[in-house]
Amino acid sequence: MAAKDVYFSSDARDKMLRGVNILANAVKVTLGPKGRNVVIEKSFGAPRSTKDGVSVAKEIELADRFENLGAQMIREVASKTNDKAGDGTTTATVLAQAIVQEGLKSVAAGMNPMDLKRGIDKAVHVVVDSIKASSKKVTTNNEIAQVGTISANGDKDVGEMIAKAMDKVGNEGVITVEEAKTAETELDVVEGMQFDRGYLSPYFITNADKMEVQLEEPLILLFEKKLSSLQPLLPVLEAVVQSGRPLVIIAEDVEGEALATLVVNKLRGGLRVAAVKAPGFGDRRKAMLEDIAILTGAQVISEDLGIKLENVSLDMLGKAKKVSITKDDTTIVDGVGEKTAIEARIGQIKKQIEDTTSDYDKEKLQERLAKLAGGVAVIRVGGSTEVEVKEKKDRVDDALNATRAAVEEGIVPGGGVALLKASKALATLVGDNDDQTAGIAIVRRALQAPIRQIAENAGVEGSIVVGKILENDSPTFGFNAQTEQYVDLIADGVIDPAKVVRTALQDAASVAGLLITTEAAIVEAPKKGGGAGGPPGGGMGGMGDMDF
């Protein structure tokens, strides 16, 4: 086992505080509408310029390992807040730095770190309740666009595009952000359920110009095994022909004689039909077939359920307004499944998302949820240069996450004002002893840090801004750093999602509490002599037992 270096109490805390300050000072310059740019060197390609706090935090690795411990703990605040709320990373970093700095001063003055932490936790609890109570629900498209615009650093087009995407696919739908091949930023919406399986034979194509199968009002047969012979299906196929409607077969595979027979019937005009492989593999395939069944009002033909192919009747087939199939994708639009059954299935998938610990499973469940709940929108971000596209994509990602959070828990005045106003709730709060009350005072002072930083980034004196806002009793009065005016922030469209503000404070206080109560820090000791250290006697470093 490698040797370790150990620092104790104030030595450990001072070293870690230096790391906290280095990282936080680099991140906090990006805060607010007049946030400055940070340029990051890349090992290959052009340097990257960004105003995204979490991107800056991820790039910082310090040479001094004790300082790096502090920096990494603050980086954890940024990434935790990003995971939970998708935005607010810079605010969380600024809050954490403020709480740590004040907290460590109090510890150095002889206060009990555990009581300070209890006071901090008590204050955070009160502030979070105050933020929740003052939040306003987001309902209109205009409000959604405002949230998106703020998070995209004032880019109105991005805000409007996100509002449009959410309007099209609903709050549960999936909205993805990709880099465009052109200079334009555009929105592409796929309504209905789409999965990544195309037609099994080009002979099924009905629209030769677009190379697509387009079937109006089709019946949909779902079979979970391979289909190699159509013999057992003849009774239901005859019934389909008599109904005069087209048929889509979705099965694990359709092969050999079965596929040939379907193609021949399609070419002769006896049966308008298309066959597609079922999406996914294994258990996920079963689940997705079940999703399609619920969406289209079908019954999955499965021997597990005791249903044989020869017993299939027309009422076991699903229905939809339209099915489009390309060589890569199948889209089912307006399935006729019962609304209550679809909602129950959505609830079930949401529960699975909450329970799963695997990121991969979560992503796949989220995709299934979107397919059931309304569709997929893709925002393709364009720009003149690669650097510009990457920077804009960061902002669009932030804006999208912030907008989702706003729809979930409502909005509060932006620009750090919600935190500043919430600090008034701490005016009469006292702890069980003086040290706890000092912890409450630490949070009260720290809540001013974000608005001070926003003002300073805009070139205005932070303490004057804080004083003016605290003098005014209106909960929505604040400083708009974009216009450098004092206004009603909600009316002016300067808003933050309540979830982002709340999460930023909770995560910042959690990590700051850990740093304040740290009594020892352990890192690996630097190796003496540095080289690659192979055993004596030739060979490459680290490969001394090989002969050459």
UniProtKB/Swiss-Prot annotation:
Annotated keywords: ATP-binding, Chaperone, Cytoplasm, Isomerase, Nucleotide-binding
Gene Ontology CC annotation, any one: cytoplasm
GO biological process annotation, one example: protein refolding
Pfam families: Cpn60_TCP1
Database matches in CDD domains: GroEL
Subunit architecture: Forms a cylinder of 14 subunits composed of two heptameric rings stacked back-to-back. Interacts with the co-chaperonin GroES.
Gene Ontology MF annotations: ATP binding; ATP-dependent protein folding chaperone; isomerase activity; unfolded protein binding
Species annotation: Caulobacter sp. (strain K31)
Protein name per the record: Chaperonin GroEL
Function per UniProt: Together with its co-chaperonin GroES, plays an essential role in assisting protein folding. The GroEL-GroES system forms a nano-cage that allows encapsulation of the non-native substrate proteins and provides a physical environment optimized to promote and accelerate protein folding.
EC numbers: 5.6.1.7
Catalysed reactions listed for this entry: ATP + H2O + a folded polypeptide = ADP + phosphate + an unfolded polypeptide
Location relative to the cell: Cytoplasm
UniProt superkingdom: Bacteria
Biased composition annotated in UniProt, kind: Gly residues: 528-548
